[in-house]
Amino acid sequence: CAFCGLCYNGSMIKIFHTNRMTRQPFFQALINYLHEHQDVTLRQIKAAFEGEKNLDRQLDAYIEAGYIHRKNRRYQNAFRLLDSLDGLSLDQEIFVDTESALFDQLKEVTFRRQMTNATNDLIIEEDVDLMRENLTLDSYFYKMRTQEELSEDQKKLYAILGDVNPDYALKYMTSFLLKFTRKDKVIQRRSDIFVQALVTLDFLEEISPQTYALTMEMDPEQLIFRKI
């Protein structure tokens, strides 16, 4: 990256669930620079990021947004680093020190999510990791909406669905899943991207050519299909 010379071997700040501002490479390099240095002046920032265009304007925007604090012509980070897992919610913006014990613990935090649709009463239920790196349908649609970078597993689903409209995709995916309320095996003779997506998500498995079985837990009365 343009700021590789400013990367550090020690602790760094990692941001989860970035917005358009906090996703910027300069923003991420700047907060790590301020994390490593104390009593930083504007002159020091300009020397460290020589050649960065509109630096003053960007800095003012970060201050106005509440991410950077300026006092007595000195600059420091104004956000709070994560110090507890208590009260975490899915998709909240998180700043965490990569050397913190919490950084590894975050990888184990999951939330049970239910996804409804406008076509029928079927509900898809998944355990979604806080980092949204695992392959779940909920996280895939989330990243399509926020334009966050896909994980390698999620890219496999993108190769099938692309930036599909969630309502459109759910219409066909749930309609196919509903067939399993009536039978254990479903035959699909024509190639179908939504069936391919269900297999990629481990909602289904192809037990023989063009024949599929459900790999989810199903509550036929409440129409809840839970990924195992």
Language-model features, listed with the residues they occupy:
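Short hydrophobic alpha-helical segments enriched in small aliphatic residues
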Residues: 2-5
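Polyanion-binding and phosphate-handling cores
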Residues: 12-102
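Short amphipathic alpha-helical interface segments
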Residues: 23-43, 98-189
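Short amphipathic alpha-helical interaction segments
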Residues: 49-64, 184-201
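A short, conserved structural fragment
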Residues: 63-74, 195-211
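Short, amphipathic alpha-helical interaction segments positioned at domain boundaries
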Residues: 81-115, 218-228
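Charge-dense, extended regions
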Residues: 199-202, 208-210, 215-228
